[in-house]
Amino acid sequence: MSVLFPINLEGALEALLFVSPEPLSLKKIAQTLELSVEEAKEIVLRLQEKLEQDQRGIMLHFSGEEVWLTTRPDFSVYIERLFKPPAQHLTQATLETLAIIAYKQPVTKTEIELIRGVKADSSIATLLEKGLIEEAGRKDAPGRPIIYRTTAKFLEFFGLKSLDELPPLNLENEAVNDGNNNFEE
């Protein structure tokens, strides 16, 4: 064993496996740690046993001539939490805008603003960014305004198979049209 300086070989192997984007061959491990292939295999087996005994968060896999690390399945719930995308919270204004688009599509920004009575730029930008709506072309009207429609992601987000599954609007109980395209409680 011709090591450059005294070192914890299991620790060195663990570091190599941690930074390697792919499995390492025994030969590559031996070359890197300046060991024989047989010595490298001993270090691999010792580290594998040590990780198993200590119930660490990682496991060493040794198959044929390749060695790699994975996370221990027992801890998968924590890993999923770490990488789970944050919940997509939509403001009341954004939900109102989305409802208008869902029920009136295809619809322009101006039409949305006439119904809501306020600007819809921010809500539309949020819905586009989250992929819940998309541009559906341009309306054949002066200025050729962009028209919007919902996406497949919208259906998935709300657990719908099609727009036909949208609940019917009950304008008598929830909102009434005051004749000016403004809805009031």
From Swiss-Prot:
Gene Ontology biological process terms in this record: cell division; chromosome separation; DNA replication
Keywords on record: Cell cycle, Cell division, Chromosome partition, Cytoplasm
Subcellular location: Cytoplasm
Keyword set includes Cell division: yes
Protein's UniProt keywords contain Cytoplasm: yes
Cellular compartments per GO CC: cytoplasm
Primary location recorded for the protein, binned into one broad class: cytoplasm
Classification via InterPro entries: ScpB_csome_segregation (IPR005234), WH-like_DNA-bd_sf (IPR036388), WH_DNA-bd_sf (IPR036390)
Top-rank taxon: Bacteria
Described purpose of this protein according to its UniProt entry: Participates in chromosomal partition during cell division. May act via the formation of a condensin-like complex containing Smc and ScpA that pull DNA away from mid-cell into both cell halves.
Family (UniProt): Belongs to the ScpB family.
Oligomer and partners: Homodimer. Homodimerization may be required to stabilize the binding of ScpA to the Smc head domains. Component of a cohesin-like complex composed of ScpA, ScpB and the Smc homodimer, in which ScpA and ScpB bind to the head domain of Smc. The presence of the three proteins is required for the association of the complex with DNA.
Stored HAMAP family: ScpB
PANTHER family (alphabetical): SEGREGATION AND CONDENSATION PROTEIN B
Protein name: Segregation and condensation protein B
